[in-house]
Amino acid sequence: KGSSGSPTPPIAAAPTAPPPQPKAPEIALPPPAAPPPVVIQPTPAPSNSPVLADDPTIKSLSEKLDKNPDDAAALYRRGQVYASKGAYDLAVKDFTNSLRLNPKDVEAYNNRCWVRTVIGDLQAALKDCNEALRLRPNFVDALDSRGLMNLKGGQNKNAIADFDAALKINPRLTSSLYGRGLAKQRNGAVAEGDLDIANAKAMDPNIVKEFADYGVQ
């Protein structure tokens, strides 16, 4: 029974274990900022520059732009390809340069509005969508983009108004139908929202994932 004193030495070792723990919270904090760009990417896994540079469309457009940096159409097209591959910052840069050369390009304003909405730059997105709609009133794509921007910003009534206007022009616009469903649910009209969502899913089963990629669920 004299061995009862032996449990005490291990206790001395215990204090050495806790010190590493304070570092864990620091490591846990940065990740939340990183996931969005990854989640947003549609199909291609990593959208790192080597992969983008190898894309044949981007390659040929970049070669075109090397010869003529003021080719607004090539900048716009490359911006579209970047956006489709989840390289949103590069897309914004190309749309901005394209608009510098062609300040009345409604499509470029709408595309930059949409990309800025996806990355959460909502104030700038609103300006772009409003400019697109000033240049081309009732432009269905810009109404759809602004609806998404309002939905992300929690402006559900404005989102419903934008999606309503878009659906009046194109009743089969799945993104507006699904977006309106979410906005209606959040605004308290749950049954109406459910109906819009069910109809949108029947038209395009991928719409749920698409919106999740935009940061909207």
Give the positions of each predicted feature:
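Terminal, low-structured helical/coil segments at or just beyond the last alpha-helical repeat
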Residues: Q185-Q217
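Canonical positions in the second alpha-helix
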Residues: K64, N97-S98, E131-A132, A165-A166, ...
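Register position in tetratricopeptide repeats
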Residues: S84, V118-I119, K152-G153, R186
